[in-house]
Amino acid sequence: MTKKSDAPAIRFKGFSDTWEQRKFEEIAVRSSVICSDDTLPRVEYEDIVSGTGRLNKDIYAKQSSKSGIVFHQGDVLYGKLRPYLQNWLLPTFDGLAVGDFWVLQPQNADSSFLYRLIQSRQFDEVANQSTGTKMPRADWKLVSKTVFSIPSNISEQAAIGTYFTALDSLITLHQRKPFLMKWRTSDANRNQTNRLVL
């Protein structure tokens, strides 16, 4: 169901191709290969900083023999349990997704763009029309049939994904600045105190 769509008013220089209306299932497919290979790192809900797509620990240091869905670098992990928690990850390594994850493999789409698409307001609204009350889960039947407007040119998708990745890195850097300044100040004070004691 690929239909042409109006392109947004603001575009990256050099791109003039049309955008398309495509169902999510035409952009990504779910992997469901289960494995318990002890050599692969495991990613669980508790390992992801909610809403940031960052890991909060060295997952290679974890000891686990749990089974999980195999993912590869370039796949996108989406936490379908309680989707409002925004547990997502664009891994730069191969591993196992343990728990209620969708492992999404891009289809005629750039993985960084797909990663940004699952963070969009439209995707979030659809995913949060979930099933279950105590443990709500995103409904694949609903999400997979939802139509999204995407660039037909994969290079433009990659440019959009790269832009937002750089923006996230810049935001993270600025959020860490006060912490680093405080750390440097306390370290300088500690060094000054040590000099006085000697």
Stretch-by-stretch model annotation:
Residues 1-198:
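Feature detects amphipathic, helix-rich regulatory segments
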